[in-house]
């Protein structure tokens, strides 16, 4: 962690105190600490944001993406605990970045955990992070498969059931992804769950026929969960 990172953290917490008060700022500090401690505990690199202009690669839809952002492990864990999954479910992180969510998802009863990442640099970091956890029995890393590919070039195998998005795309890309998912439902009708964190365009999923089945708020983060079927 750089000195600049901790300076920015200090200013962020001071701003939060002025805006939210002591109690919520202490909760926010815990989440920030959880963010950093996760990396230190498992010897990985996943806690710092990376803007697209810092990544050295060319891709048609690069301008339609957003920066790699981090989310506290507690938040991810809580969301996955609240949503009902089956042991046959296949989890896909569309824009998996450094692979943090993949590691946490591997602890749950998913049949497979797949990450799609278009940046070669982030893909390599994610692979290294997974590799550093191979001997750690806290995660089931053999379930994880990371694919370095533009998400619009990824061919859905018509069996994926749980899609995770941490606000990774513009509205244009999100529309095309929803169309691809709906197209796969024609070939293999099944229950789909979409976990949308920091949702900028939830109306797109609603317009595409997905129903919001859950909402989870945690101070400065929101998560909407959608499905093509209403769970009982």
Model-derived features: where do they sit?
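Active-site segment flanking the S-adenosylmethionine/decSAM binding pocket
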Residues: 146-186
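C-terminal substrate-binding/active-site "lid" region of AdoMet-derived donor-dependent transferases
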Residues: 172-230
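Short beta-strand element of Class I
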Residues: 111-116
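Conserved SAM/SAH-binding beta-strand->alpha-helix loop
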Residues: 119
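S-adenosyl-L-methionine
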Residues: 1-86, 123-158
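Conserved class I S-adenosyl-L-methionine
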Residues: 89-97
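Glycine-rich SAM-binding Motif I of class I
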Residues: 99-103
